[in-house]
Amino acid sequence: MKAVILIPARLDSSRLEKKMLADLQGEPLIVRTWRQALKSRLADRVVVATDNDEIASVLQAYGAEVVMTSPHARCGTERIAEAAKSIEGDIYVNLQGDEPLISPENIDLALEPFFTETPPDCSTLVFPLLPEDFRQLEDINTVKVVMDNAGYALYFSRSPIPYQRQISTSTECYRHIGLYAFRADVLHAFASLAPSMLELAESLEQLRLLENGYRIRCVKTTRDAPGVNTYEDLELVRQLLRNAPVQ
């Protein structure tokens, strides 16, 4: 069973210009993400998929393996599906390029279900939200998820789910961490599907899988780290690195 981490990286970003090349203690953000991916125990290979020559040149100077892709990908999963056509693997991990503090243990948590007798179509990670995290529940940039009793996703939304008619501390709420692992056949099938109605409504690519009958296994984790979507996120990551450098 060969597992490959694919990191989609594009230069254009609507909320933070050229964020993939933003400086983090002397290294570009995308390089930090790549270095964390290399620490995975279960992955056999790490490749960055980009359509940008500048990103490719920067990464190659650090020794990273890079695959050039079309600029027409509609989402990160489509970009890695294109890259996967030329990269042999049984499982592909979609690790967002803007996750410079990603825990290697989280990557392995997402991969572990595939090394069982009944590997899922896809897996992803979820993090528990506590009652005091109500701001995240209301934040449209925080994606929430509800699951069935077997741990498979029922729905992902930017809205607070489940809706709590009566506030109860016994109601479990989870935030989605945007890291996915796919069986090879499922990844290639995803790329052949048109964007779905709910995917377009929520701007959440994983809903394309749910709407087409695929199941997403949600793995709970207690490890969390901020991604970088805004300038405020970037400053937070810089502060965290100053206080506790990632080894």
UniProtKB/Swiss-Prot annotation:
Its main location: cytoplasm. This is 3-deoxy-manno-octulosonate cytidylyltransferase. Keywords: Cytoplasm, Lipopolysaccharide biosynthesis, Nucleotidyltransferase, Transferase. It is found in: Cytoplasm. CDD domains: CMP-KDO-Synthetase (cd02517). Belongs to the KdsB family. GO terms for cellular component: cytosol. One of its GO terms (biological process) is lipopolysaccharide biosynthetic process. Activates KDO (a required 8-carbon sugar) for incorporation into bacterial lipopolysaccharide in Gram-negative bacteria. GO terms for molecular function: 3-deoxy-manno-octulosonate cytidylyltransferase activity. It is an enzyme of class 2 (transferase). Its EC number is 2.7.7.38. It catalyses: 3-deoxy-alpha-D-manno-oct-2-ulosonate + CTP = CMP-3-deoxy-beta-D-manno-octulosonate + diphosphate. Pathway: Nucleotide-sugar biosynthesis; CMP-3-deoxy-D-manno-octulosonate biosynthesis; CMP-3-deoxy-D-manno-octulosonate from 3-deoxy-D-manno-octulosonate and CTP: step 1/1; Bacterial outer membrane biogenesis; lipopolysaccharide biosynthesis.
